[in-house]
Amino acid sequence: MVSRDFIFWEVDVQADFMLPGGKLYVPGAEKLLPNIRRLTDAARQGRVFLVSHGDFHAPNDPEFKIFPPHCVKGTAGAELVPEALTDKVVRVENDAAAKIPDDLSNYQQILLEKQTLSIFETHHADALVQKLGNQAEFVVFGVVTEYCVSFAVKGLRERGRRVAVVQDAIETLNPEDGQKTIAEWQRLGARLMTTDQALSALG
């Protein structure tokens, strides 16, 4: 049975970030893949609903003035790694005309596309969080700690949701910045857990 107490929230687990040789590879990110798979397996098994989001950029995206080109939509680098995907995914483009399905129970996972660091700058993130309600705790994991993961954690907290972060399923670019970011999350009321703890909590 799908948990009513937890929702898993997966950030940018895409080939260009996660794999050596990726366009914006996060050193060490591939070491997270066993835990990413374990967390995603829980959604595959119908134990928890999985929200995922990722970068899906146009070739001339303005972000490429700040970061090297990465996760260009339609390229292999933009795709979620296999460990991060379930068998029943609904994908929602960042377009006002796109729709979140009325009944998410037909799916194990929803994948929201974004073009900026914050998922909450997209058309559908707020509506999805509203639809998911405020009973469940949102369990966040992925990359990168001090960028998109942090925007997700802070965005969920700003919307009054309880948040936990899976500390052995996130990766940072700069360890010092990562520690400061984690401390900020804790000040905002987010808690830390391990992959084992996240899975045990599902019962």
Which functions belong to the PLM regions below?
Residues 2-8:
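Extreme N-terminal starter segment of soluble prokaryotic enzymes
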Residues 5, 49, 137, 161-164:
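Residues at the starts of beta-strands that form the adenosine-phosphate
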Residues 9-11, 54, 141, 167:
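Active-site flanking residues adjacent to catalytic metal/cofactor-binding acidic residues
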Residues 18-29:
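Acidic/histidine-rich helix-loop elements
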Residues 34-137:
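Active-site alpha/beta core segments
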Residues 36-42, 147-158:
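Histidine-anchored nucleotide/phosphate-binding helix
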Residues 139-142, 161-175:
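A short glycine-rich beta-strand->turn/loop micro-motif centered on a GG-aromatic cluster
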Residues 190-201:
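Short acidic-hydrophobic, aromatic-tinged amphipathic segments that line or gate anion-handling sites
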